[in-house]
């Protein structure tokens, strides 16, 4: 069985030979109409044999039969491969083997859908569905891979091969697709003319036919070259090319005459052979006729007048040729010859000669003497002065030669005389009222004379109304020229020389200052460096970038000022170095607050008197602290003695000096001071001071109370003696929680071991990595004895015992408050001992159980007993502070209260917050400034008594409670008011409050800004500790100054200027993608606004410039300069065949942009739908426009040749029925339709296999004709 579905008539005709026995269904018809109408069966083939019978459903033809079907985007074609041409014949089952793989590969490559079926004769039918392009590609693949291939050759002339290939090989590819063949064309360097075709027989025949058709078409056309002497070309072309144009129009032949600038004699003819022969004959006739009749005469014309004879674009020569029929031959421009040859008929040469002399003498050249420096004044701003002359006399050309003292005028004689008189008057006037001066200034100073953005030179120009020309840097010239009013020139010259003299006296000096001092010299917010710059205003001081880690500070300015500034800064640095000497002063913990004083009064006084910086220590739990003092060495040392004297006076301190060799000092101090620290801790309240390293001094100073200095002195001396004789070290390990117990309270336990053995025992500090390592140092005997004692202590700590003691139940709460903090401290201090309080509810047990190492338990019991004694002696006092300050006093997460509690060993309890305080109209003020409160009832409350919510309870020993009360009262915040203009409030607050938050965090205060509704209020409230208020106020006022400066700058920047510019120039000022206007905006830092085209209320010629006044004026001048250049431009329309527009423009406009950039012109092509599609407008300077037009006309001539060839090829490729399509359509006609004939055929025999053929194998009854859908 075979079934086909063909959508195009070409496909039907192509495969008809292989499907003669098959019934064909045509689903789309070709648009061509033939003379003989098709039969009904040809037009409407029945469905395949196995399909349900549709004949009964056929309707008679009616009006609908005349409507032609619309072509579908998806088409279906069927290809039949006969058994003898199949590549793969051995198939056991349908769809298996190599054939199935090839079909899958074709579907993947092309995107088309393939279905295979086998006919009874084992021929292969392939149905291909998809888009037309995909179907054609699949067809080519099927023929190449599933059908055996044949090959044939066809011979055509070698010159016709390129027409078979087509542009970029497109025609060859299309031919291969249509014929499903492979066509091989020999290479250009191969002399063979044989073209090889590979494919099916039908495809080869069709391809061969198409190739021969192309060759035959080219045989009809011919190209001929005729050699004609160059001098006779003008006669053949005729005036303005009229003669050759008429000839081309009459004969339909294309004639190419080389232009006069090209030294070629060949004239090329292209066209149909007969018409071409006519054109060649007519040209030969003209040539022979002119050769016989013409003669020549030679005349001498000045070389400078040749261009007048030629005229613009050769118009004068064409004019003479048209009037007289005489050709005028002008020697080339690079030739020195002045001979002009006239060629023509003798009787017309006289008239032509008259015309030549008339053209030559119609123009004259004249020159006016004028100093070259006056040229630009004669031209005027944007050529305004010169334009007055050229507008009156447009044919005149005025030329200024740089460096020459003359002005050349060229044009009609009368116009030149008038222009010469006007220029002479202008020159005389300018010489009387202008002057110039030249000065020599080293070019390295030129940019300083110009100033930033031309500030200096523009000021001089505006002030003295002069023009100053400073040569560019690349010229390396020292000459500066000043031109303008005589008095202004002299004043400008004087000022420029003064500036240059000052700069020559200027010098640059590098100052070496350590980077660590840079920030100090600059000062907070640049205050100190501002003072230096105010003191030396002519000196520029440049500090290096902090990231560069450079010590070089650069000073630039007048020599004397730089020297003074250098000495001043060197002195400042010397003071900083001198004041950077620092020393640590050890003080005993108990005297710390006495030396600092209440509220830091004492230490502040010491700072002011000594002019030094003193850093206070942290509040760590050490027995002694270090004050860090920084300033002059001598002052710091005196200050150290002064602080130590205060301490000595307070505690009656004794100073003892011990002589220890300096070489042993480092060993005695130990790594990071560990060893000497252990001695000081052991002796308690002792300071040991070593001399500075490298001093060579052997004196070690010990400061201690009168009765305690002997022991540290003895320890130091003993250790030094042992070190000199013998030293022995042993490491011991113990759990960190045992260390405190091993040391004992106040170092009692470890002191006992040291006294017994004489060994030094060093425990790890919190900074050491190994927290279990204990080091024992001394003689071997002492170290071993100390090791035994410590090991025994550690062993005892490992032996856990349980003990109990009696504690009054009223004190139990003290041990468990704050999540059992007291119990945790006892456990940490005494080797992790566990203390358990009674938990039985309803009983008042006083028994407390302790569990741990025996020694630890005993020590813990002693500590608990001490705590109980303190609780028995505890008192409670009240501190009245208004509740509104409680949160501030507590600090973040209660940190301030926790610190006071630790420092003074007291407990502090704040009252509950009062949820609904009774309203008080006028709260009474107490003498201490606290607000009065009311009682619970609000009636009987004493106005003078404090409110309950204001009372803070402090518990502890009386003296400690009083000290804690003073510390609390010192934390009460103070409020001050600062006056700030209301309009600055929103800037101080910042975006989403960021500005005010930053200030509050920086100065640790609360800043309250009045609400926006209170517009009359300028008061900002600052609340915080007294010490922070001054800094906060200064910071706020500094911010106000910055904001006011910004406001002034905004006002200056809002200056507006309006420029009147014709709207037609706006696109040029804006530039491509806004490039020109963006450059002006960026260069002058201004905003430029163009009028809105859609807004009729706006003046369309007004451009608004906003910015600083000077910048706005400079931007205006830049815009007017562009406008001046645009006004000098001209626009010319040139007729350019619209068919070559696309090629001249190029891909994405690249080609036309290149032409515009080369000739500096603007070229505009007509838009689609324009009245004249060939009109192209060229805009630019006159000489550039002429050159650009000549260039694009040459391109047109070159590209039109290709256009003509392409059009001729397209005409050939069109179907032959083009002319027949003009005949009115007869409608759709078929012959032998069933509705028009009597059906005498008998019904088919259902049992006949001839009428109803079937597949060889049994198949399912519902199988579709083309197999299952995939």
Swiss-Prot record:
InterPro entries linked: KH_dom (IPR004087), KH_dom_type_1 (IPR004088), KH_dom_type_1_sf (IPR036612)
The keyword RNA-binding is assigned to this record: yes
Domain KH: 150-188, 219-260, 291-333, 360-402, 431-473, 504-545, 577-619, 651-693, 724-766, 798-840, 872-913, 970-1012, 1051-1093, 1126-1168
Location of this chain's protein in the cell: Cytoplasm
Database matches in PANTHER family: SCP160, VIGILIN
Disordered as annotated region, ranges: 1-23, 28-47, 911-947, 1217-1270
Xref: PROSITE patterns: KH_TYPE_1 (PS50084)
Biased composition (Polar residues): 1-11
Biased composition (Basic and acidic residues): 933-947
Domain of life where this protein originates: Eukaryota
Organism: Gallus gallus (Chicken)
Matching SUPFAM superfamilies: Eukaryotic type KH-domain (KH-domain type I)
Name the UniProt record assigns to this protein: Vigilin
MF terms (GO), sorted A to Z: mRNA binding
Keyword terms, alphabetized: Cytoplasm, Repeat, RNA-binding
GO cellular component assignments: cytoplasm
């Amino acid at each position: 069985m075979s079934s086909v579905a063909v959508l195009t008539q070409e496909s039907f005709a192509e495969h008809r030979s292989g499907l003669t026995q098959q019934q064909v269904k045509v689903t789309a018809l070709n648009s061509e109409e033939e003379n003989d109408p098709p039969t009904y069966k040809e037009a409407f083939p029945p469905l395949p044999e196995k399909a349900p019978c549709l004949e009964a459903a056929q309707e008679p033809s009616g009006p609908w039969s005349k409507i032609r079907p619309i072509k579908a985007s998806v088409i279906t074609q069927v290809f039949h491969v006969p058994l003898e041409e199949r590549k793969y014949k051995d198939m056991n089952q349908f769809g298996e083997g190599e054939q199935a793989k090839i079909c899958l590969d074709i579907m993947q490559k092309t995107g088309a859908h393939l279905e295979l079926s086998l006919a009874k004769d084992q021929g292969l039918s392939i149905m291909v569905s998809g888009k037309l392009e995909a179907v054609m590609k699949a067809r080519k693949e099927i023929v190449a891979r599933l059908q055996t291939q044949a090959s044939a050759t066809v011979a055509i002339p070698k010159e016709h091969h390129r027409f078979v290939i087509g542009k970029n090989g497109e025609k060859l590819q299309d031919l291969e697709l249509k014929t499903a063949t492979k066509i091989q064309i020999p290479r250009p360097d191969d002399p063979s003319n044989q073209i090889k075709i590979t494919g099916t027989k039908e495809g080869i025949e069709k391809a061969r036919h198409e190739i021969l058709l192309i060759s035959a078409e080219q045989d009809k056309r011919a190209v001929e070259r005729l050699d004609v002497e160059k001098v006779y070309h003008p006669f053949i072309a005729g005036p303005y090319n009229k003669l050759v144009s008429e000839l081309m129009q009459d004969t339909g032949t294309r004639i190419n005459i080389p232009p006069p600038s090209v030294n070629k004699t060949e004239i090329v003819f292209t066209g149909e052979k007969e018409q071409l022969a006519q054109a060649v004959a007519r040209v030969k006739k003209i040539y022979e006729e002119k050769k016989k009749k013409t003669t020549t005469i030679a005349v001498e014309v000045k070389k400078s007048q040749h261009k007048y004879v030629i005229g613009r674009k050769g118009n004068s020569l064409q004019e003479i040729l048209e009037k007289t029929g005489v050709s005028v031959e002008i020697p080339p421009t690079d030739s020195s010859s002045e001979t002009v040859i006239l060629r023509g008929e003798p009787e017309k040469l006289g008239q032509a000669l008259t015309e030549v002399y008339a053209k030559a003498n119609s123009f004259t050249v004249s020159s006016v003497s004028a100093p070259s420096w006056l040229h630009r004044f004669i031209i005027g701003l944007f050529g305004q002065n010169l334009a007055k002359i050229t507008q009156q006399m447009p044919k005149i050309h005025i030329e200024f030669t740089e460096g020459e003292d003359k002005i050349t005028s060229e044009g009609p004689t009368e116009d030149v005389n008038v222009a010469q008189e006007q220029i002479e008057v202008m020159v005389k006037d300018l010489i009387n009222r202008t002057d110039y001066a030249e000065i020599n200034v080293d070019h390295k100073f030129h940019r300083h004379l110009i100033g930033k953005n031309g500030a200096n030179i523009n000021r001089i120009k505006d002030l003295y109304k002069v023009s100053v020309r400073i040569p560019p840097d690349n010229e390396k010239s020292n000459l500066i020229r000043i031109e303008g009013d005589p008095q202004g020139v002299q004043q400008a010259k004087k000022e420029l020389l003064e500036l240059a003299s000052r700069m020559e006296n200027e010098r640059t000096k590098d100052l070496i200052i350590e980077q660590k001092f840079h920030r100090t010299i600059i000062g907070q917010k640049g205050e100190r460096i501002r003072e230096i710059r105010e003191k030396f205003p002519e000196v520029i001081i440049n500090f290096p970038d902090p990231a560069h880690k450079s010590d070089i500070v650069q000073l630039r300015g007048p020599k004397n000022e730089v020297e003074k500034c250098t000495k001043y800064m060197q002195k400042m640095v010397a003071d900083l170095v001198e004041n950077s000497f620092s020393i640590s002063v050890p003080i005993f913990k108990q005297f710390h607050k006495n030396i600092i004083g209440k509220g830091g009064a004492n230490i502040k006084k010491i700072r002011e008197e000594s002019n030094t910086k003193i850093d206070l220590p942290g509040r760590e739990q050490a027995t002694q602290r270090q004050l860090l003092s920084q300033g002059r060495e001598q002052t710091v040392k005196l200050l150290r003695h002064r602080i130590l004297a205060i301490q000595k006076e307070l505690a009656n301190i004794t100073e003892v000096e011990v002589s220890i060799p300096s070489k042993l000092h480092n060993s005695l101090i130990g790594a990071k001071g560990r060893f000497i620290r252990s001695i000081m801790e052991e002796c308690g309240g002792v300071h040991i001071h070593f001399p500075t390293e490298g001093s060579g001094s052997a004196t070690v100073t010990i400061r201690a109370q009168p009765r305690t200095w002997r022991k540290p002195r003895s320890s130091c001396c003993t250790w030094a003696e042992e070190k000199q004789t013998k030293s022995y070290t042993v490491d011991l390990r113990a759990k960190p929680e045992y260390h405190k117990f091993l040391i004992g309270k106040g170092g009692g336990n470890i002191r006992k071991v040291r006294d017994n053995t004489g060994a030094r025992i060093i425990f790890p500090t919190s900074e050491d990595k190994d927290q279990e390592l204990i080091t024992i140092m001394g003689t071997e005997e002492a170290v071993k004895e100390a090791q035994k004692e410590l090991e025994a202590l550690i062993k005892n700590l490992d032996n856990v015992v349980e003990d109990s003691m009696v504690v009054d139940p009223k004190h139990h709460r003290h041990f468990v408050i704050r999540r059992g903090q007291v119990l945790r401290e006892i456990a940490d201090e005494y080797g992790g001992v566990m203390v358990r309080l009674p938990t039985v509810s309803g009983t008042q047990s006083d028994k407390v159980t302790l569990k741990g190492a025996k020694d630890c338990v005993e020590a813990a019991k002693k500590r608990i007993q001490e705590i109980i004694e303190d609780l028995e002696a505890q008192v409670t006092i009240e501190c009245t502070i208004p509740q509104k300050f409680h949160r501030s006093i507590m600090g973040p997460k209660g940190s301030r209260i926790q610190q006071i509690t630790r420092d003074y060993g007291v407990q502090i309890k704040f009252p509950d917050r009062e949820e609904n305080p009774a309203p008080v109209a006028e709260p009474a003020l107490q003498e201490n400034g606290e607000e009065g409160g009311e009682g619970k009832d609000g009636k009987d409350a004493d106005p003078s008594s404090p409110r309950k919510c204001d009372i803070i309870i402090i518990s502890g020993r009386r003296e400690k409670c009083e000290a804690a009360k003073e510390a609390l009262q010192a934390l009460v915040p103070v409020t001050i008011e600062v006056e700030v203009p209301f309009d600055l409030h929103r800037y101080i607050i910042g975006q989403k409050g960021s500005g005010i938050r930053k200030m509050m965090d920086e100065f640790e205060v609360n800043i309250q800004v009045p609400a926006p509704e209170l517009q009359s209020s300028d008061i900002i409230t600052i609340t915080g500790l007294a010490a922070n208020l001054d800094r906060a106020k200064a910071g706020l006022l500094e911010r106000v100054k910055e904001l006011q400066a910004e406001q002034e700058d905004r006002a200056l920047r809002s200056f507006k200027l309006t420029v009147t510019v014709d709207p037609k120039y706006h696109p040029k000022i804006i530039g491509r993608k806004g490039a020109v206007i963006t450059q002006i905006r960026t260069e002058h830092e201004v905003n430029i606004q163009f009028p809105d085209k859609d807004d009729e209320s706006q003046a369309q010629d007004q451009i608004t410039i906003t910015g600083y006044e000077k910048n706005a004026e400079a931007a205006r001048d830049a815009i007017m300069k562009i406008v001046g250049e645009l006004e000098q431009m001209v626009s010319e329309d040139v007729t350019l065949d619209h068919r070559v527009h696309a090629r001249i423009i190029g891909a994405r406009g690249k080609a036309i942009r290149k032409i515009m950039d080369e000739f500096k012109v603007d070229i505009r092509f007509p838009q689609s739908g324009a009245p004249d599609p060939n009109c192209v407008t060229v805009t630019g300077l006159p000489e550039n426009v002429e050159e650009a037009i000549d260039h694009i006309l040459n391109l047109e001539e070159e590209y039109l040749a290709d256009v003509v060839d392409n059009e001729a090829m397209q005409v050939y490729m069109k179907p032959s029925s083009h002319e027949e399509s003009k005949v009115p359509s007869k409608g759709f006609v078929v012959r032998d339709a069933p509705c028009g004939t009597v059906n005498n055929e008998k019904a088919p025999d259902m049992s006949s296999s001839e009428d109803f053929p079937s597949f060889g194998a049994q198949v399912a009854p519902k199988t579709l004709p083309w197999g299952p859908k995939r």
